[in-house]
Amino acid sequence: MARYDSLKPDPAQGVFETTLVANGTAVEVEAHLARLEASLDELYGMALPSRARSLIEEGASGLELGRLRLTVVPGDDPSVRTAAVDAALVFPKQATELAPVTVPGGIGPHKWADRRLLDQAQAELEPAMPLVLDSDGTPLEGSRSNLFLARDGSLATPPTDGRILPGVARARAIEVARTAGIEVSERDLTLDELAAADEVFMTGGVRGVEPVGRCEGLGEWDSGELTARVRAGLQRAWLGADDSS
């Protein structure tokens, strides 16, 4: 199993947020801005740039389906970059594959612009997506998404304890699940639990809910009822409708 502990992010490159854009509107924009504001205050002692919200609104305008990236670098003006997204990549039905990698202490709670560690891991593992483990083997998150497992009708996901990104999609998925009567526990997971799970899925700010079909060395899973229910609920929250019918 690969271990990545030498490529620490360069704080001077700043932090960023990526949001889904649907019908000219950035999805969950307030939650993304709140997370960015918290990172800027903690890391640099700076406030959210006053132009951040207007830059997002301008960038999202006219984009039917896409992603928007807002980057803030200390000492520079914030920048926005947008791109159209293939509809098949938003709430994808095709299952993804994971491959475990060790990152002692995890990636942390900030969305660093310096993604050398993640980019290196992704390049070495493609087509699989890195599943980040702590040094003791605790599963934490994906390189671009948060981890959920389903077992016996309930969900579990790693806690936001400083080792993982407090995902916007993660928070909304938990809300959707609990509103639907699905129990969700936020706690440390084990590799044995992951291997024994009935279903595994990831959540992310652009892809929404993404089923996991396989993890190297751990097992394979089918996309089942709980994944479908959370997916449909998040689709309705973000897009106003779901494709479950």
Locate each region found by the language model.
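Helix-start/capping segments and mature chain N-termini
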Residues: 1-58, 62-67, 71-245
